[in-house]
């Protein structure tokens, strides 16, 4: 009996890989440290090159099958449209307004992350094609390519005492990858000198229609730019009675004495709202709708997190050495990029598509053929992913430019129109 592929992590890259392997009748098991109830209810932006590739890989599904399942506003007939206009977050004035995209052929759309993960997991080709996900399995050890009765196998050991053997181990466990830490301890995430504060809150549908709709219309995001800082308001999920939303306050660090930047902050400290943050935001004199939610009184009622911005890059020699030991990386485990301005979710999905495609061709052949297939996966994805990490760092600063530069860009666009 063929040993399964062991996939560590039930995020976008892990579930995409597992779904496509399962559809191809390649046995695999996904191990997730969190319980089934874990939530990642915020929304992400999906690019056309990412969601179109996924739809093709799943059997040329129509775009509507995706948007009806994952759009933050799906329950009220929306399709995840986002207005890509940039507004001055003090005056509300539109600085730049690209043409509105059509529902039939968008270049970008918003997706609720929880709903997207569930949709990928459920996108099987038949009733017997359910993904095998084992929750509550936190990886603590790996044994790589030992000789056994079934040939070369990898072994994964978990904190609950469970042990599984497989033909291949896929590291899909994110920026804090346990797999990477165990076998490539010298590769550590880089913390960027930027700050990103994120607040979650809820509105009633009546409040949403009254205070957000006049500014956002049908858009699931209201992008606000200031003088070197950003304050987007985003819709995460809409029901008949409640709207889940979040705000982000982000800017580059202002040096060694920045009271809001602490690269050594603990997870518990990251949940505390610093008074310096409230003072700084109040001093910005934001206009509506941002001022309604980014103010001291409102923020104290929200769940607020200080998100450290981490990036991960690896050398080709690192991944090559792991391939020979039966390990392959997908998603943020080997190319993490900033949440703000990055496209990590899209690249995670694309990794899963590319790897599954290569493994499907080589499956059932020799170990050398499988390793050659993994090499082709890296050949195809290496430049894409490394360039994306580099661009994402640059993009953060481009999106946090002085307001005078935003206005100058807008004026030049008007002259060219």
UniProtKB/Swiss-Prot annotation:
- What did gene disruption experiments reveal? Fails to produce asperthecin.
**From which domain of life does this come?**
Eukaryota
The UniProt catalytic activity note for this protein reads: 3,6,8,9-tetrahydroxy-1-oxo-3-(2-oxopropyl)-1,2,3,4-tetrahydroanthracene-2-carboxyl-[ACP] + NADPH + O2 + H(+) = 2,3,6,8,9-pentahydroxy-1-oxo-3-(2-oxopropyl)-1,2,3,4-tetrahydroanthracene-2-carboxyl-[ACP] + NADP(+) + H2O
Q: What is this protein called?
A: FAD-dependent monooxygenase aptC
Q: What organism is listed for this UniProt entry?
A: Emericella nidulans (strain FGSC A4 / ATCC 38163 / CBS 112.46 / NRRL 194 / M139) (Aspergillus nidulans)
Its pathway is: Secondary metabolite biosynthesis
Q: What is its EC number?
A: 1.14.14.-
Its biological function?
A: FAD-dependent monooxygenase; part of the gene cluster that mediates the biosynthesis of asperthecin, an anthraquinone pigment. Polyketide synthase (PKS) aptA catalyzes the formation of the aromatic polyketide from acetyl coenzyme A and seven malonyl coenzyme A molecules. Polyketide is subsequently hydrolyzed by the action of the hydrolase aptB into endocrocin-9-anthrone. Endocrocin-9-anthrone is then oxidized into endocrocin by the monooxygenase aptC.
Tell me the first and last residues of the signal peptide.
1-18
Q: Could you say which enzyme class this protein belongs to?
A: oxidoreductase
Q: Which GO terms describe its molecular function?
A: monooxygenase activity
Locate the residues binding FAD: 32, 43, 117, 332, 345
Give the classification, highest ranks.
Eukaryota, Fungi, Dikarya, Ascomycota, Pezizomycotina
Its keywords, alphabetically, are: FAD, Flavoprotein, Monooxygenase, Oxidoreductase, Signal
Needed cofactors: FAD
Q: Its Gene Ontology biological processes?
A: asperthecin biosynthetic process; secondary metabolite biosynthetic process
What upregulates this protein?
Expression is induced during late sexual development in the dark.
Report the InterPro entries cross-referenced here.
FAD/NAD-bd_sf
């Amino acid at each position: 009996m063929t040993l399964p592929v062991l996939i560590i992590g039930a995020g976008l890259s892990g579930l995409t890989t597992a779904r496509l392997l399962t559809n191809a009748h390649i046995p695999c098991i996904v191990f997730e440290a969190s319980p089934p109830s874990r939530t990642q209810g915020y929304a992400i932006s999906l690019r056309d090159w990412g969601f179109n590739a996924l739809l093709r890989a799943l059997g040329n599904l129509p775009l509507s099958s995706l948007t009806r399942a994952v759009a933050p506003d799906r329950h009220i007939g929306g399709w995840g449209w986002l207005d890509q206009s940039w507004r001055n977050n003090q005056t509300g004035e539109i600085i730049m307004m690209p043409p509105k995209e059509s529902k039939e052929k968008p270049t970008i759309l918003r997706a609720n992350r929880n709903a997207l993960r569930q949709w990928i997991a459920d996108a099987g080709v038949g009733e017997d094609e359910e993904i095998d996900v084992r929750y509550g399995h936190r990886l603590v050890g790996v044994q790589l390519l030992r000789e056994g009765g079934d040939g070369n196998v990898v072994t994964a050991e978990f904190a609950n005492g469970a042990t599984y053997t497989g033909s291949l181990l896929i590291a899909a466990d994110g920026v804090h990858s346990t797999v990477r830490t165990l076998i490539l301890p010298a590769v550590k995430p880089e913390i960027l000198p930027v700050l990103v504060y994120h607040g979650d809150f809820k509105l009633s549908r009546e409040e949403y229609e009254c205070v957000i709709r006049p500014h956002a219309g049908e858009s699931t995001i209201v992008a606000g730019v200031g003088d070197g800082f950003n304050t987007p308001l985003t819709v995460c999920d809409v029901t008949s009675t409640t709207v889940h939303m979040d705000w982000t306050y982000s800017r580059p660090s202002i040096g060694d004495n920045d009271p809001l930047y602490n690269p050594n902050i603990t997870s518990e400290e990251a949940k505390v709202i610093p008074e310096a943050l409230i003072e700084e935001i109040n001093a910005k004199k934001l206009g509506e709708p941002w001022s309604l939610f980014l103010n001291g009184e409102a923020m104290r009622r929200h769940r607020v997190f200080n998100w450290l911005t981490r990036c991960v890059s690896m050398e080709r020699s690192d991944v090559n050495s792991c391939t020979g030991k039966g390990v392959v990386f997908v998603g943020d485990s080997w190319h993490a990029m900033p949440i703000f301005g990055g496209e990590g979710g899209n690249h995670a999905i694309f990794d899963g598509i590319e790897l599954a495609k290569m493994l499907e061709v080589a499956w059932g052949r020799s170990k050398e053929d499988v390793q050659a297939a993994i090499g082709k996966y890296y050949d195809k994805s290496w430049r894409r992913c490394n360039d994306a990490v580099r661009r994402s760092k640059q993009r953060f600063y481009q999106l946090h430019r002085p307001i005078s530069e935003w206005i100058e860009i807008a004026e030049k666009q008007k002259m060219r129109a």
